[in-house]
Amino acid sequence: MKTAITILMITMAVSEFSASQNVNWRSLRDDQNNLVQFNFGYDYGVTAGMGYARTFSAIRPVLLGLDISLPMGNNLSDDFKVRLGGQIEIVEIAGFAATVRVASVFRKYHNDFVNIASFGSDFGIVAGYSAPTWSIGGEFGFDKAITSHLKHAAIMKEMFPDIKDGWYVPTGGNYYYGLAAGKTLGETYDLSLRLGATRAQGNDENAILPMYLQLGLGARF
């Protein structure tokens, strides 16, 4: 019972997929190295977020960035997610391109029973067609909590005296797959859409509504 409760607590904290900035490499100008994005959507609940990223020229185009997302609610500091990572376009042929994303993820989750801090990783790939004013493609990724620290409330310790605070290593993660599209507005702004499904590794902890939706507005400068 104690093990099952611990697994459930960690699953509650890390079940959301890793949202990230959409980038259309074809729409970026040489004098636009900075990107900011604001997004809103559904991610195991209604969420909002913002992020900043900067592009660099290497062998292939590279984007490094930081973003934060929070659920819509009264106590925004109780639950949040911070991602630090990068994207690189690995191939481009006549507008058809593939981009790889890698990020480290920190999550905080709190309720009346437990406070959880989780460190994890996210790996994804986006492949599709990009033109200077629009893009569309498919994405696939895997989001995994590497380790989580649980601090249980007094009520939990009263109900389950053997339960322990400390670090735990989850055994699973979450796959996500879906559509990624974008539309350039003028010389500076971009609209983006991400829509897809999520699936827990092992199919044993899937969400009641296993999907995600993200609408974003970005600016390049």
Q: How should these model regions be labeled?
A:
Residues 31-35, 45, 57-63, 91-97, ...:
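Strand-connecting loop/turn motifs
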Residues 32-34, 44-48, 62, 78-82, ...:
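Residues that define the transmembrane beta-barrel architecture of outer-membrane proteins
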Residues 36-40, 64-68, 98-102, 136-140, ...:
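Membrane-embedded beta-strand positions of outer-membrane beta-barrel proteins
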Residues 50-52, 82-86, 123-125, 177-179, ...:
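Membrane-embedded beta-strands of outer-membrane beta-barrel proteins
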